[in-house]
Amino acid sequence: MPEYWDLYDRQLRPLNRKYERDDKKRMPKGEFHIVVNILSINKDGEILITKRHPDKPYGNMWEISGGSVLSGESPLDGAVRELFEETGLKAAPQELRYMGQIIRERSGCIHNFYLYEGDFDEDSITLQEGETVDFSLVTPKEIAKMSDSGEFLDFAFNRMRAVFGDIFFHHI
């Protein structure tokens, strides 16, 4: 079943058009869709990361949860859905805290970042078949090492540092 996204201009004004996802082509210039990224931290201060399915773009790379907001969905609802789909964690919308936004002109993405501080452990995680193949609970320092070694998506790590900054990454 095709995936559709609502289109926006750079100022997040709706263009009242939908776009069918196609990994082989870029978004039209000056048009954007919303992508959500969720940094999930448990009571022990560990960050949940997942490993992408080998058949997906950037396969076998580690990242935090996230994905595109579907047509008709709010960014917050998209974040709740993506977190559940990729990890099995059921967060209520009020449990996700909006942390910031990064606009990527080249890819036509407006990235919204959320923080989820939840009571979860390894037994709470259920991976999404076809999307994720592994997970780990790690420290920010471990993520930095994984980024340096090419195991963690470097652009995702750089965006995390830009948005979450001193909150979690000041000791790296």
Language-model features: locations:
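A glycine-rich, hydrophobic loop/mini-helix early in the fold
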Residues: 33-66
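The catalytic Nudix box helix
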Residues: 48-49, 64-97
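Nudix hydrolase/Nudix homology domain
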Residues: 14, 59-61, 71, 98-100, ...
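Acidic, metal-coordinating catalytic segment for phosphate/diphosphate chemistry
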Residues: 1-37, 43
